[in-house]
UniProtKB/Swiss-Prot annotation:
Belongs to the cytochrome b family. Its cofactor is heme b. Component of the ubiquinol-cytochrome c reductase complex (complex III or cytochrome b-c1 complex) that is part of the mitochondrial respiratory chain. The b-c1 complex mediates electron transfer from ubiquinol to cytochrome c. Contributes to the generation of a proton gradient across the mitochondrial membrane that is then used for ATP synthesis. Heme b b566 binds at H97, H196. Heme 1 (or BL or b562) is low-potential and absorbs at about 562 nm, and heme 2 (or BH or b566) is high-potential and absorbs at about 566 nm. Its main location: mitochondrion. Binds 2 heme b groups non-covalently. The chain crosses the membrane at residues 33-53, 77-98, 113-133, 178-198, 226-246, 288-308, 320-340, 347-367. GO terms for cellular component: mitochondrial inner membrane; respiratory chain complex III. It is found in: Mitochondrion inner membrane. It comes from Anguilla reinhardtii. Keywords: Electron transport, Heme, Iron, Membrane, Metal-binding, Mitochondrion, Mitochondrion inner membrane, Respiratory chain, Transmembrane, Transmembrane helix, Transport, Ubiquinone. This is Cytochrome b.
Length: 379
């Protein structure tokens, strides 16, 4: 009699994705981040659910309800710290996962890659609306500044902003709908993740050498299930340590002050994981131009597969392209630093140079160097 996990309609799906999935034998730890992102999502949904049981989405009580969670709810402080810092780990894993895809040419699985970019945008939206909920100073002013960017849309801009606000300023209606969105989006992300996996399993995983690995596949379980488990333990340990020892390390001190529409904080800035995009937004001295650059900084990922010129898939055997990849990593770090700095000399020009370099790497330098490498190898 055939094994139940191979015949039962529901178990068969899980079996084909987690047990009998043929996996390239040589995938490295860089392939762990997909499952780590799944773990982050589950962790965020669970901690978020418990926070939602005690949170009130009303401007008069939102801030004090968060304080109440931290002071009076059993282990509320822990749940909140895990949720807030879990978001940071979510983005760390996301950036590493995307970097792996760029380095090893995983973007050539176009459907999987494009759904991944959509997932990235969804997670960014979720994090943004979630940041507004505690109704601290930076929550309020962050919401005001970022939603205001929509007013740059020609003709319908102002109407669009007021429609999203539910009034003439960020107010109670805004907070209520942002809470509704923040509750809904993670489930949309979970659904999109299933589609992401569906397309990935149509082709199978890529591998570090970028060659067809059909001749050398091994079952996912037990080999990679245990390898993933090690990643889980490392990440959960790091998250727990951050949440217990340095819970406010990555937060903004302004969020310990309740939102006050009458007082603008000296430096409005988002959480660290949005700083690179914020730096690109600020580097263009025009509202609409900045908004377009902000959108393009993420959507540029969608054109990477189209601009792939090399005859090889990954960068494993392409030193010149490797150099460009690490320049991109350094550029992202510079942009992240600039995003947290005030708008003054020399930060303005550094941000502008870094922004130009960011787009040049994706749109010009990488395709050009890929083509040059082909020429050098007489391909």
């Amino acid at each position: 009699m055939a094994n139940l996990r191979k015949t039962h309609p529901l178990l068969k799906i899980a079996n084909d994705a987690l047990v009998d999935l043929p996996t390239p034998s040589n995938i490295s730890a860089w392939w762990n981040f997909g499952s780590l992102l799944g773990l982050c999502l589950i962790s965020q949904i669970l901690t978020g659910l418990f926070l939602a049981m005690h949170y009130t989405s009303d401007i008069s009580t939102a801030f004090s309800s968060v304080a109440h969670i931290c002071r009076d709810v059993n282990y509320g402080w822990l749940i909140r710290n895990l949720h807030a810092n879990g978001a940071s780990f979510f983005f760390i894993c996301l950036y590493l996962h995307i970097a792996r895809g760029l380095y090893y040419g995983s973007y050539l699985y176009k459907e999987t890659w494009n759904i991944g970019v959509v997932l990235f945008l969804l997670v960014m939206m979720t994090a943004f609306v979630g940041y507004v909920l505690p109704w601290g100073q930076m929550s309020f002013w962050g919401a005001t500044v970022i939603t205001n960017l929509l007013s740059a849309v020609p003709y319908v801009g102002n109407s669009l902003v007021q429609w999203i606000w539910g009034g003439f300023s960020v107010d109670n209606a805004t907070l209520t709908r942002f809470f509704a969105f923040h509750f809904l989006f993670p489930f949309v992300v979970a659904g999109a993740t299933m589609i992401h996996l569906l397309f990935l399993h149509e082709t199978g995983s890529n591998n570090p050498v970028g060659l067809n690995s059909d001749a050398d596949k091994i079952p996912f379980h037990p080999y990679f299930s245990y390898k993933d488990l090690l990643g889980f333990i490392i990440m959960l340990t790091a998250l727990t340590m951050l949440a217990l020892f340095y819970p406010n390390l990555l937060g903004d001190p302004d969020n310990f002050t309740p939102a006050n529409p009458m007082v603008t904080p000296p430096h409005i800035k988002p959480e660290w994981y949005f700083l690179f995009a914020y730096a690109i937004l600020r580097s263009i001295p025009n509202k609409l131009g900045g908004v377009l650059a902000l959108l393009s900084s993420i959507l540029v990922l969608m054109v990477v597969p189209i601009l792939h010129t090399s005859k090889q898939r990954g960068l494993t055997f392409r030193p010149a392209s490797q150099l460009l990849f690490w320049i991109l990593v350094a550029d992202m770090l510079v942009l992240t630093w600039i995003g947290g700095m005030p708008v003054e000399h020399p930060y303005i020009i550094i941000g502008q140079v870094a922004s130009v370099l960011y787009f040049s790497l994706f749109l010009v330098l990488n395709p050009l160097v890929g083509w040059l490498e082909n020429k050098m190898m007489n391909w």
